Amino acid sequence: MKADIRVNGSTKLIGVIGNPIKHTVSPQLHNTLSSNLNHNFIYIPMLVNEGDVGAAVKGLRALNFTGFNITVPYKNEVIKHIDEISEEARLIGAVNTVKNDGGVLKGYNTDAAGFAASFKEQLGMGFEGKRVAILGAGGTARAIAVKIAMEKAAKITIINRTAARAAEIAELLLKELGIRAEYIDSASKGVAAVIQDVDIIVNTTSAGMHPDVDNCPLSQENCCFSPGQAVYDVIYKPEETKLLKAAREKGCIVSNGLGMLF
């Protein structure tokens, strides 16, 4: 649906900064929502060049933007240019949403909350008391791991090709949140045992994303799923990745990451 946008002197300014920015669908979603709900705001995509994040934030503050989102590659860098961040954002080490509260810029991370809401809605379970395996150790993995830990999972295992990055997340979860956390190299023979032992598996890697649809974050011998396990893939294109197909065929409940967008 095309957004019917009317701008006047009372229109609130909201936007998103990043580089590149042409790919973002956020303006279409937010402006359509504004129009449909008769809210008086406009959402603007803004390209910010490398080295200009501080100047951009200063300008958004001066222009009295109600708030703004941050996309790649500035979710980490923006932190040093705002006034406060939430505890969850501090642990994740990234901010994707900033609210202007009377001139005070407060940073939040809603990526993890979007994942948790989508997971619970699609798969019908929470994380408390669950054993979880997370595939990958990038920014998305860290955000999801922190969220799952904050919701009192029993144990989290990070599976990644680079052990050092996985170890960093595991150490964070143990030190800051007191959650039993481990890590394992994705090439290790112990991966199969981890997959068999957990209640929930979350893929945060790009393995299997279009156009590389024949790829899978787990080798065939490690796709040893059990009926009733929950398998969530943050990828949503294709709708069913090779990982999800293998899990579904073994009797798991599965979901892609499309719900994280809403």
Labelled PLM ranges:
Residues 2-123, 262:
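Phosphate/diphosphate ligand-binding glycine-rich loop within oxidoreductases
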Residues 117, 121, 236-237, 252-262:
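Active-site capping/gating segments
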Residues 22, 164, 237:
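Conserved Rossmann-like nucleotide-cofactor binding loop
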Residues 18, 107-112, 119, 123-150, ...:
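Glycine-rich adenosine-cofactor-binding loop
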Residues 7-8, 127-128, 152, 218-228:
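Short, conserved loop/helix-junction motifs that constitute active-site signature segments
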Residues 151-177:
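NAD(P)-binding Rossmann-fold cofactor-contacting core
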Residues 180-255:
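Rossmann-like adenosine-cofactor binding region
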Residues 13, 131, 154-156, 180:
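Residues at the starts of beta-strands that form the adenosine-phosphate
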